[in-house]
Amino acid sequence: MDQKQIEEIVRSVMASMGQAAPAPSEAKCATTNCAAPVTSESCALDLGSAEAKAWIGVENPHRADVLTELRRSTVARVCTGRTGPRPRTQALLRFLADHSRSKDTVLKEVPEEWVKAQGLLEVRSEISDKNLYLTRPDMGRRLCAEAVEALKAQCVANPDVQVVISDGLSTDAITVNYEEILPPLMAGLKQAGLKVGTPFFVRYGRVKIEDQIGEILGAKVVILLVGERPGLGQSESLSCYAVYSPRMATTVEADRTCISNIHQGGTPPVEAAAVIVDLAKRMLEQKASGINMTR
């Protein structure tokens, strides 16, 4: 699916909701609008700032303008320079800072207060803590007994579409993108005339847990919004895993359709919501998902 198709879907879905489509967006580069990059090292520079990300470490370049343009065009680690065979101090410190940020978002917990503030029912997998979540992924694929009973008692049965939110491997991905993706997603699904289930939050969930959820609730389509494994310096990326009529015993990974890189520096959450609505409609029409869908 190319950018033009995405924009058409966004316009169509937003129009059906009676809202104006957002202007065509481009992935935001952290270095695009910053001041001219500097080459001198500074211990006072905030390593997470736009200035630090725009820093050029190549000394005495032949074409400084080329390096400046390259540095402004990407958030990748380019133009960092070397000192002999080693990276320069500022480049190394920024690498370590980004690594620390990514590690933190894996280990952090989604606050219970945040979940309550969103009005979400909270359930959990068979995992009891973060350490077990990281070492026993198999247990993150199944709901605990209390969660099963809670879903049966408090959630809409047999929905066309069931939306699930889970922390996954990035707490920031959920808390940062939630407000921009869930309201338009729920509104778009309802506007499409679909029976939408009760959205809820699964703590310590893995992707395959959506199979059990779909089976318990009798959902035709299950949409799981889950935090992606963070990259260096990028801890806010969300993924959507959608599957048609999932079953614990028979559903395999090829049956899922994935939309990844949902964040302000990738696919904007509002655009992603419109694409997910269109995807759910096509899944219901074709009664398929993943590689079984016709393109």
Curated annotation (Swiss-Prot):
Highest taxon above the source species: Bacteria
InterPro entries in the record: EutC (IPR009246), EutC_C (IPR042251)
One GO CC term on file: ethanolamine degradation polyhedral organelle
Functional description taken from the UniProt entry: Catalyzes the deamination of various vicinal amino-alcohols to oxo compounds. Allows this organism to utilize ethanolamine as the sole source of nitrogen and carbon in the presence of external vitamin B12.
Family annotation (HAMAP family): EutC (MF_00601)
Known pathway: Amine and polyamine degradation; ethanolamine degradation
UniProt family annotation: Belongs to the EutC family.
Annotated adenosylcob(III)alamin binding sites: 207, 228, 258
Record-level GO BP terms: amino acid metabolic process; ethanolamine catabolic process
Cofactor note: Binds between the large and small subunits.
NCBIfam families linked to this entry: PRK05465.1
Cofactor(s) this protein cannot do without: adenosylcob(III)alamin
Predominant location: other
Cellular localization per UniProt: Bacterial microcompartment
EC number: 4.3.1.7
GO molecular function (one): cobalamin binding
Subunit organization: The basic unit is a heterodimer which dimerizes to form tetramers. The heterotetramers trimerize; 6 large subunits form a core ring with 6 small subunits projecting outwards.
Chemical reaction(s) catalysed: ethanolamine = acetaldehyde + NH4(+)
The encoding gene: eutC
Name this protein carries in UniProt: Ethanolamine ammonia-lyase small subunit
Keywords: Bacterial microcompartment, Cobalamin, Cobalt, Lyase
